[in-house]
Amino acid sequence: MSNESTNPQQEPLEQVQDTEVVTDEAALVDELTQANFRIEELEQALAAAEAKVEEQKDSVVRAAAEVDNIRRRAAMDVEKANKFALEKFANELLPVLDNMERALAGTNAEDEATKAMYEGVSLTMKTLVNAVEKFGVKVVDPMGQPFNPEQHQAIGMQPNPEVPANHVMVVLQKGYELNGRLLRPAMVMVSQGGGVDTQA
């Protein structure tokens, strides 16, 4: 009998456990629903954050590219400034060189009275030309070369059977370049080629 008395007490206990399980199941379903809702919210927040990160990465890449472009432009500007800083000064020296050439052309190197002056002007001019060449100034002396309108300024054309057509036959004034940039074109006379037909 003692076994029978124990059995009735166990049945209500099992019923209570079933009730707790059912109650716990409903609570779990509720918790799972809330957890799923929270997971969806977090996934949306994560997607928004990832989109923002991609946007920021794009902005950073663009900013870095802009900084590189600015650096390149600044470096090019500095290089140009260094390369052509002497342009104005060199342009001021060109008439001095022209006058020295005229002085040499107008002086007879063989005449004893003017020989010393000729040598002095010649050495001074040579020294000045060497000095400006050190800073990138280059003489453009196109005698006998084909006419180039980018570097030469034609004063006129004359027939000359000894010089091919469209070639420089006389340099009236030399031109000058500074680091490849034309400071002043050479003033030249250009050959038309063969002589003038006088029998016509």
UniProtKB/Swiss-Prot annotation:
Its domain of life reads: Bacteria
Gene Ontology terms describing biological process: protein folding
Entry's Gene Ontology molecular function annotations: adenyl-nucleotide exchange factor activity; protein homodimerization activity; protein-folding chaperone binding; unfolded protein binding
Keyword field contains ATP-binding: no
| Localization (cell) | Cytoplasm
Keyword Chaperone tagged: yes
Q: What is its main location?
A: cytoplasm
Q: Which UniProt keywords apply?
A: Chaperone, Cytoplasm, Stress response
Here the disulfide bonds are none
Cellular component per GO? cytosol
Under the heading Pfam families, the entry gives: GrpE
Q: What is the protein's known function?
A: Participates actively in the response to hyperosmotic and heat shock by preventing the aggregation of stress-denatured proteins, in association with DnaK and GrpE. It is the nucleotide exchange factor for DnaK and may function as a thermosensor. Unfolded proteins bind initially to DnaJ; upon interaction with the DnaJ-bound protein, DnaK hydrolyzes its bound ATP, resulting in the formation of a stable complex. GrpE releases ADP from DnaK; ATP binding to DnaK triggers the release of the substrate protein, thus completing the reaction cycle.
Subunit and partners: Homodimer.
Q: Which family does it belong to?
A: Belongs to the GrpE family.
User: What name goes with this protein?
Assistant: Protein GrpE
Q: Which organism is it from?
A: Shewanella amazonensis (strain ATCC BAA-1098 / SB2B)
Recorded name of the encoding gene: grpE
